[in-house]
Amino acid sequence: MSASLVGSEMCIRDSNEAVFEVLEKKKGKDEAVLFARSATAGGQKFPVHWGGDCWSDYESMEESLRGGLSLQLSGFGFWSHDIGGFENTSTADVYKRWCAFGLLSSHSRLHGSTSYRVPWAYDDEAVDVLRSFVRLKARLMPYLWKTALTAHNEGIPSMRAMVLSYTNDKMCNYLDKQYMLGDSLLVAPIFNDEGIGEYYLPKENGIWTDFFTGRQQEGGDWYTRTYAYTEIPLMVRPNTVLPLGNSEEGPEYDYADQVTFRVYDVQDEAAAEIYDMDQNKVASIVVKRIEDKLVIDCDSKKPFTVELVNTGILDVKGAKASKENKNTILRDCESHIECIQ
């Protein structure tokens, strides 16, 4: 390796480290975050990195995801990109699709070179689209915060190439237009002006569920359909307990207070944990299937709700049950609940 290359890498690492240390000194330990597009070996410990100055079109949006997944396979736990692209100004169509992708990334920001990326600069629908995905991300924060802690403590990235989550599924080896957001959510951004979403669901012990519609789909196959701007292929892995927070107004709130635990197609056992901003575990839940019975044990000092997705219940002990569409909602929950199907 040449001396000039070594010097360049040291400069990149040292500059990111220096800025991070200044932020840490100013904001306090565990509060420093920088946005960097430069990186080299060792730069993984100074997040967040973003994709740089891409063009504002579908091709660049797609390439941004491809590069981001490659970066995270290199040990970078967090990654961001400029919603709507950076160079030039995107069409309203591209912007609205990028909003969905951007808000379902580990970090999200509106940024560009020649124009403001605020949604009302595009059209009224863009405001509605951005608002809906901001609210979704706010509700997902108990899950996303746990995912972030996993990235920090274990080195498993928050946005995962499919091959990382499904090492034994050869179909996943080359998939670079979809990803796992944490353990349980599969995201497939839309990269065309027809609104066509196409994605592959790996084979699982159970059935995948569309987050928005509740539609169930078997793994081991490809799926295609057209999506509105307020939708995106967002599939929930079977055997999942997904915590949804009680706030749509911002990312910081009491994640355990009045949380809703959504239970998706538990075949054997599934669990979830909620952590506060100081990384203390403040709630946990375990759901077990025993023949025709679901047994739920939750450790929480705050009130919570359980939503059994696509599940009908005949008898419940330890909670009050009501039917909403195809789901069963459990309220006034005790720490131990038994549900007979």
What are these regions (language model features)?
Residues 319-321:
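Small-residue (G/S/T/A) turn/hinge positions that recur once per unit in extracellular repeat modules
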Residues 326-331:
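A generic structural motif
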Residues 13-16, 22:
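Alpha-helix-loop-beta-strand connector modules within alpha/beta enzyme cores
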Residues 20-33, 39-49, 60-63, 67, ...:
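Catalytic core of carbohydrate-active enzymes
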Residues 8-9, 52-55:
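Glycine-rich tight-turn/loop motif centered on a GG-T
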Residues 1-7, 11-12:
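Single conserved hydrophobic/aromatic residue that forms the stacking wall/gate
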Residues 332-341:
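Surface-exposed interaction regions enriched in Ser/Thr/Asp/Glu
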